[in-house]
């Protein structure tokens, strides 16, 4: 086993989780971190004991000993330029979703990674949720037969929605439904999406942030299978969890339902009322264990670099997801279905 040197750029919520996972991994020889907020940099450095803790990520890219970079920066427009700089420095890349803001950016990154023989994967962490993985297996092993339809409903609270929607002008399709588009396309592969229709609502977030409250998306696959995804970020602040998800996958021989609303564990206190403490999409540390998919996803990336394996999520798959949610945004804007051509360029139906 080759031990690797890893850099984490951006150590906020998700980046902090990844830095801690790297620090604890037997695959990692050296950890290096970069964070522009001094207090957060100091906090994460105290937990992870990195070799380097810098406010300037370029310091890490100049270090030839670093093999791989995990990019967990916000706002999202930073993804493309930092990923490009990292690839030009010869680093393998883990990049949080979205892969980019424009398709040409995604295509350039994919081509650059291929030309330099670099691993390049995107953070679609829900593939590492055991409940979601069971849905995938139930299709692959024939338990529910051939897929007929799917429904995914994902909604987060307004407090979290304002934090996300307020930092970048991307819709719930791009920021929330993207996880579920990736998940369903992964389950239904090798089927391809051919048509997208979407409707959005603007009653709460639009005035302040100019983003929709929620979006409902219908995607038709090339074999006629249809799936629907609803995603929003306006659950009331008093709702007792961060993220609430429900999945229905119906096949010719059966169906599988997933309740990922996190109601299986709840805490009631005099001060805060009812709370679902294990309810964030990335997950959270609970004493000596980790509840949620992000730690497993991070470990998977480290394994891929150390053991020279292909990542579960490919950049090409992330580009396909991007084409679908961009088509959803276009459909919501025009009120018309959008056809996806063979090369996945959105056009009005």
What is the predicted role of each segment?
Residues 1-48, 72, 184:
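N-terminal Rossmann-like dinucleotide-binding module
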Residues 130-158:
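Rossmann-like NAD(P)H-binding beta-loop-alpha module
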Residues 50-57:
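Conserved SAM-binding strand-loop segment of SAM-dependent methyltransferases
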Residues 72-73, 154:
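Glycine-rich, N-terminal phosphate-binding loop of Rossmann-like dinucleotide-binding domains
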Residues 160-244, 316:
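Rossmann-like dinucleotide-binding domain that binds NAD(P)(H)
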Residues 207, 222-296:
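NAD(P)-dinucleotide binding in Rossmann-like oxidoreductases
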Residues 3, 8, 28, 68-70, ...:
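C-terminal helix-rich "cap/oligomerization" subdomain common to oxidoreductases
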Residues 68, 75, 80-127, 142:
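Beta-strand-loop-alpha-helix segment that lines the small-molecule cofactor/substrate pocket
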């Amino acid at each position: 086993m080759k031990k690797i040197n890893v850099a984490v750029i951006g150590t906020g919520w998700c980046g902090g989780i990844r830095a801690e996972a790297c620090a604890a991994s037997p695959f990692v020889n050296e950890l290096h971190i970069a964070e522009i907020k001094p207090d957060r940099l100091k906090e994460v450095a105290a937990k992870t004991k990195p070799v380097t803790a810098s406010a300037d990520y370029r310091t890490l890219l100049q270090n030839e000993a670093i093999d791989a970079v995990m990019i967990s920066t916000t706002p999202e427009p930073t993804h493309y330029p930092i990923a490009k700089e990292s690839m030009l420095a010869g680093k393998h890349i883990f990049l949080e979703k979205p892969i980019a803001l424009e398709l040409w950016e995604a295509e350039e990154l994919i081509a650059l990674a291929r030309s330099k023989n670099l691993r390049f994967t995107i953070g679609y962490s829900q593939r590492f949720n055991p409940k979601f993985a069971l849905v995938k297996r139930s299709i692959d092993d024939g338990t529910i037969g051939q897929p007929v339809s799917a429904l995914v409903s994902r909604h987060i609270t307004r407090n979290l929605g304002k934090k996300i929607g307020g930092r970048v002008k991307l819709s719930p399709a791009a920021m929330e439904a993207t996880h579920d588009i990736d998940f369903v396309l992964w389950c239904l592969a090798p089927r391809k999406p051919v048509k997208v229709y979407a409707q959005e609502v603007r009653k709460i977030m639009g005035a302040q942030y100019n983003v929709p409250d929620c979006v409902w998306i219908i995607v038709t696959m090339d074999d006629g299978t249809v799936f629907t995804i609803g995603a929003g970020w306006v659950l009331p602040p008093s709702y007792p969890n961060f993220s609430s998800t429900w999945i229905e996958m119906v096949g010719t021989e059966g169906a599988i339902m997933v309740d990922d609303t996190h109601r299986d564990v709840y805490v009631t206190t005099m001060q805060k009322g009812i709370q679902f403490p294990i309810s964030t999409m990335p997950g959270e540390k609970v004493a000596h264990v980790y509840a949620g998919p992000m730690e497993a996803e991070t470990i998977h990336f480290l394994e891929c670099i150390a053991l020279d394996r292909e990542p579960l999520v490919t950049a090409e798959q992330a580009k396909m997801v991007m084409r679908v949610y961009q088509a959803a945004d276009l459909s919501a804007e025009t009120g018309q279905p959008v056809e996806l051509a063979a090369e996945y360029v959105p056009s009005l139906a």
